[in-house]
A protein has these predicted regions:
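N-terminal processing/targeting junctions
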Residues: 13-15, 104, 112, 174, ...
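N-terminal non-cleavable signal-anchor helices
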Residues: 13-14, 78, 254
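C-terminal motif of bacterial Sec signal peptides marking the signal peptidase cleavage site
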Residues: 18-21
Length: 645
């Protein structure tokens, strides 16, 4: 019997094929004369629209009715749909989650029992662009967790977002993505499972997708070059060097060409080649570091081609001048430490700026075609004439010793101000890390701070750009430096760095090893200095700030460079409606507001405003923040604040 039924079914199918197949718009059994009018669209907003249609001579066999829509013509039920169950004479659906400024094609449909969908004629509509007020009203703050220790491991890397970021470098590529590259450091050394110089990317600087390591193995040239130098120095080769992969910089050179300059440290003692630890100390300094080069035509591929050595650590001492009397001696063998590169193109000339601790920051000219030094390097010892044609010319230093706490230069040019800027990391990275800034009208210097002092002479640069801090209802952040500074091509500038949890945060194992990537907005003062916002960037719609919004309580933090390792806390500053400051450090002062430039002047200090996320609020929400500088009796202070009431 079953076989007979199947045979009969095949015959029916064959007959129907001979008579001609049915289209989606043709009626099936039990539908009668049911038809659909073309849909009408109303109440169109940037994210929604209402679509209605009339069903003529509706059939009782209808099991569902609705609307299908797409950004492509002739949508079907395989595209997006909004529907209801059962029969009726009308269809009315509100489409939500639409994209702004987009054309949508829409058809009404009904589905009768055991029949294909019947479609109406097609209608189209265009959503308008959302107003800033609409965007702000609908804004949802980022939800990712800062304490990522529960998913810090390699297996959970799809959840990282900005977790496990250290020493970031950010470039905006031709495909519209921002690509972030970094040091290998990670909580629990998770990155060891996936190569070196790790990459992630984002379209909005808020949501980041991890792509993986850009280098799977240390290039052979590093060991070869290391032991070549050791042979010239009369030293035995190191067969198994201990490597550290640190602080790359990535720049777009031109369409189809991106360069990464990366740092590889050899963490072995010079004399014996033993790994660097206190037990192995052999009265010598540790080995030299190297800066190498990789290139790619497509950052999205995450495939980079290594181009070899660019430069290495160099010394003004003799090749055998590496003796170190004790671990407490800081008269370093190397003059320039070849890590922490940054790269800038200036009118067709290319420059590499690098350096960490030791004697300061160096600048060397690069061949635009090869990406390697323009002039041939000599031996990296016994150097007496430091120029951009050798291992580099000294352009900035923190003091005059051979072991000074400054590193991580980042050099950019702002055409709006006409200045080049050099950002530097001061102090040790775990806690006291803080950022300073210099500027120059020439990429070759002189680089001066806000006091006009030339950094080549060895200065304590002012002002402080970022510093360990703490708003209420949080543990705050420390180790905020070694930054990337970049713009989006539309005049908006950003600062990115790692930040760490403070030591001994309750409930967090090894809390100071929790490193999170931060991205912050930069504004530029009327005098052409960058101020970095105190709260992280969250793509908050920048609705113009009205004066009335400024009245109330603010958490204010005042920072300076005179408190090594201190995490600055906040105090309340209250602005009254009659333009008086009624609480806080500036109590008794007055305030005014320049709405055109979004600058609050409080007690005579100009504070630059921005809408940002209040990351300490629960749940996170939007607020207004400020940043500025002022000179207080010869001490430059950095003023950060956020509106809380």
């Amino acid at each position: 019997m079953i076989k007979i039924k199947n045979l009969f079914g095949c015959a029916v199918v064959g007959l129907s094929l001979l008579l001609g197949g049915c289209s989606d718009d043709e009626k099936g059994t039990g539908i009668g004369n049911m038809t659909l009018d073309a849909p009408k669209v109303s109440d169109v907003t940037y994210k929604s629209a209402t679509v209605s249609a009339t069903i003529n001579e509706p059939s009782a066999t209808v099991i569902k009715r609705g609307v299908c829509y797409s950004t492509e013509a002739e949508p079907t039920v395989e595209n997006s749909i909004a529907e209801k169950q059962g029969a009726a004479s009308t269809i009315s659906e509100t489409l939500t989650g639409l994209a702004e400024n987009t054309t949508y094609y829409v058809r009404a449909f009904v589905v009768a029992y055991e029949n294909e969908p019947i479609y109406s004629e097609e209608t189209s509509f265009v959503t308008p662009a959302a107003t800033l007020d609409e965007q702000l009203a609908d804004y949802v703050a980022p939800a990712y967790e800062d304490d990522y220790t529960a998913f810090a491991g390699w297996e959970q890397r799809d959840r990282w977002n900005l977790a496990n970021v250290h020493d970031p470098s950010v470039v905006k590529a031709e495909d519209g993505y921002y690509y972030m590259y970094q040091t290998d450091a990670s909580y629990g050394n998770a990155h060891e499972a996936g190569g070196h110089f790790h990459c992630r990317r984002s379209l909005d600087l808020v949501n980041w997708v991890y792509l993986g390591g850009t280098m799977q193995e240390i290039p052979a040239w590093v060991k070869e070059k290391l032991n070549e130098y050791r042979a010239e120095m009369g030293l035995e080769p190191i067969e198994s060097p201990v490597y550290g992969c640190w602080a790359p910089v990535v720049r777009k050179v031109r369409d189809g060409l991106y360069r990464m300059y990366y740092s590889i440290v050899v963490d072995n003692y010079i004399k014996t080649g033993a790994p660097n630890n206190e037990e192995n100390f052999d009265n010598s300094w540790t080995e030299r570091a190297f800066i190498g080069l990789m290139e790619t035509s497509d950052p999205a591929s995450n495939v980079w081609e290594d181009k070899g050595m660019v430069i290495c650590s160099s010394s003004d001492k003799a090749m055998d001048g590496w003796t170190r009397p004790s671990l407490g001696n800081w008269d370093a063998y190397f003059y320039f430490n070849a890590i922490d590169p940054t790269y800038i193109i200036d009118g067709g000339r290319h420059w590499l700026v690098y350096g960490s601790w030791h004697s300061g920051i160096a600048e060397i000219e690069i061949d635009p075609e090869t990406g390697l030094p323009k002039n041939k390097l000599g031996n990296p010892w016994g150097i007496s004439n430091w120029t951009t044609g050798t291992y580099g010319q000294l352009v900035a230093r923190r003091g005059t010793s051979r072991w000074q706490g400054s590193e991580g230069p980042e050099v950019v040019y702002n055409p709006e101000t006409g200045y080049y800027y050099m950002f530097l990391a001061y102090g040790s990275l775990a806690v006291e890390y803080n950022t300073r800034v210099l500027r120059s009208q020439s990429v070759n210097g002189p680089w001066v701070d806000i006091n006009g002092a030339d950094a080549a002479n060895g200065i304590e640069a002012q002002p402080v750009v970022t510093h360990p801090y703490k708003f209420d209802n949080s543990n705050g952040w420390v180790g905020i430096s070694h930054c990337a500074v970049f713009d989006d091509g539309d005049g908006n500038w950003f600062y990115s760095s790692q930040a760490r949890f403070p030591e001994d945060v309750p409930g967090v194992n090894a809390s100071n090893a929790v490193m999170m990537g931060h991205v912050r907005s930069i504004r530029w003062t009327e005098d052409g200095w960058p101020v970095v916002m105190p709260e992280r960037y969250g793509a908050v719609p920048q609705v113009p700030i009205k004066e009335g919004e400024l009245v109330g309580d603010w958490e204010m933090i005042q920072m300076d460079g005179n408190h090594v390792g201190q995490q600055f806390g906040s105090a309340i500053m209250t602005l009254s409606a009659d333009h008086k400051i009624t609480q806080g450090t500036w109590k008794g002062g007055t305030w005014s507001y320049d709405a055109t430039n979004q600058v609050l002047t409080a007690n005579g200090v100009k504070l630059y405003l921005q809408r940002e996320v209040d990351w300490e609020a629960f749940p996170r929400s939007t607020t207004i923040v400020f940043a500025g500088y002022h000179n207080s009796n010869g001490t430059w202070r950095t003023d950060w604040g956020k509106k809380v009431e």
